[in-house]
A protein has these predicted regions:
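Low-complexity intrinsically disordered segments
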Residues: 39-136
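Mixed-charge, Lys/Arg-rich low-complexity intrinsically disordered regions
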Residues: 134-148
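Short, solvent-exposed secondary-structure boundary/capping segments
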Residues: 173-186
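Intrinsically disordered, low-complexity, charged/polar segments
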Residues: 183-214
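Short beta-strand scaffold segments in enzyme catalytic cores
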Residues: 4-9, 90
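Short beta-strand-centered aromatic/proline hotspots
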Residues: 161-176
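His-enriched metal-coordination microenvironments in redox/metal-binding proteins
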Residues: 1-6, 22, 26-32
Length: 214
C-alpha cells in the first residue's frame, strides 16, 4: 500500500531507462509532486535534467518533509516501480511535470491546496533555510504596479532564499552595467543613502511579478 510515484527526466519508456530517478512511496499524487517541484523552483535550485545537484536538492526537500528512513528512494529508473498502479511516472523538466506514463486512473489527486502544501514543506526544512509562512501568503503583483516605499521579497541567489527590501526608485535611461534599466524598479539591497542604490544591477527587479510583504 502507498501513494506511489516515480519522478524521472527520461522522456521515453522510463521503465526501460537507466536514467537516475526517484521513487516516492507516499505523497505521489500530482498535487504533492507539483508542490515539491514548485518549492525547489522557488529556491532557485538547478533542474535535475541539467545538473545532478537538482536531484540531490529535490531528495533533500522531500526527505526533510517525510522524515524517517523510508518513503523515498533513488535508483536507475528501470529498477524503480514505474508502473506502480497509483500515480505512475512523472517526467519533469525545469521543475514542471511535462509528461506522464503508466497513470491509469480517470482523475488526478487534488486533495492539497498548493499554498498550504508549500507551507507544510517549508516548515519541515531546517529553520535557516525556510521561507516562512508569510512569504507564501504574501500577495503577488505585477512589477508595473510597484510604488516607491513598497516592501517586497527579493531573491538572494547565494543563499537560495528571499529577503525583504524596500522599493526606492525606478531606473532611468542611463544604462547600468551595460543594460538598460529605464522604468525598472529597484530596491535598497546593496548601497547606502550616500551612494544611492541605482548603480548596482543586483538591486533591480527583473521577475514579471513580486510578492509584497505585509
Amino acid at each position: 500500500m502507498g501513494n506511489r510515484a516515480v519522478l524521472t527526466t527520461c522522456m521515453y519508456e522510463p521503465k526501460n531507462s537507466t536514467t537516475t530517478s526517484i521513487y516516492l512511496h507516499w505523497n505521489g499524487g500530482r498535487d504533492s509532486v507539483e508542490a515539491f517541484l514548485t518549492y525547489c523552483k522557488l529556491k532557485g535550485y538547478r533542474p535535475p535534467e541539467t545538473d545532478c545537484y537538482g536531484w540531490a536538492r529535490l531528495c533533500q526537500v522531500i526527505g526533510n518533509f517525510f522524515g524517517g528512513s523510508t518513503s523515498i528512494g533513488i535508483d536507475a529508473c528501470c529498477n524503480l516501480d514505474c508502473d506502480n498502479g497509483d500515480n505512475g511516472t512523472y517526467v519533469i523538466k525545469n521543475w514542471k511535470i511535462v509528461r506522464r506514463y503508466y497513470f491509469k486512473h480517470k482523475f488526478e489527486q487534488h486533495n492539497h491546496d498548493l499554498t498550504e502544501m508549500l507551507i507544510a514543506i517549508d516548515k519541515a526544512q531546517p529553520i535557516a533555510e525556510q521561507f516562512g509562512e508569510d512569504f507564501f501568503r504574501a500577495k503577488e503583483i505585477p512589477i508595473n504596479e510597484l510604488e516607491i516605499g513598497n516592501e517586497v521579497y527579493v531573491f538572494d541567489s547565494l543563499d537560495c532564499k528571499y529577503t525583504k527590501h524596500k522599493v526606492v526608485g525606478f531606473g532611468t535611461e542611463e544604462r547600468v552595467n551595460g543594460l538598460g534599466r529605464n522604468g525598472v524598479s529597484y530596491v535598497n539591497k546593496y548601497g547606502d543613502a550616500e551612494r544611492g542604490y541605482a548603480w548596482n544591477p543586483n538591486n533591480y527587479i527583473h521577475t514579471p511579478t513580486v510578492r509584497l510583504c505585509k
